[in-house]
Amino acid sequence: MCIRDRERREQRHRDNLENGVALETVIRDYLSPKHRDRAATGCPTAALVAEIARHPKATREAFTGKMSDILALMAAQMPEATPAEQRRRAIAAYATMVGALQLSRAVSDRQLSEEILENAVDAALALAKGR
């Protein structure tokens, strides 16, 4: 059940990006306290990325394909930039988002967790906008 919920959430993020939901909305949703607090049904990337790194090449290739899809969807929402710049910004924003979500879940200090999320939203938005 847990994996299915995660897959649905990941698909919702993809659907949002494909359907033109503003990248800012996706970033804010991903880095929300609600998403942080629902680790069991949240993003599989944030939950499993360290484990995926230890898996065979075939698993990592499947992960790479899914991640590449997400990056392409994010990059497409970054107008007024070259394709290379869009990709660079998408990678930086997504890495910020995933890392911040992991850290916000790992710390025991609730205030620090909130600060991580809030600052990561600002950072990811700045990266997405090329600032």
Model-derived features: where do they sit?
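Hydrophobic alpha-helical connector segments
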Residues: Q11-G42
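Alpha-helical bundle regulatory/interaction domains
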Residues: G20-L23, D29, H55-T59, L103
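Hydrophobic/aromatic-rich alpha-helical bundle segments in the mid-to-C-terminal region
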Residues: K57-T64, Q77-R131
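Helix-loop "lid/cap" segments that line or gate small-molecule binding pockets
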Residues: L31-R36, T45-H55
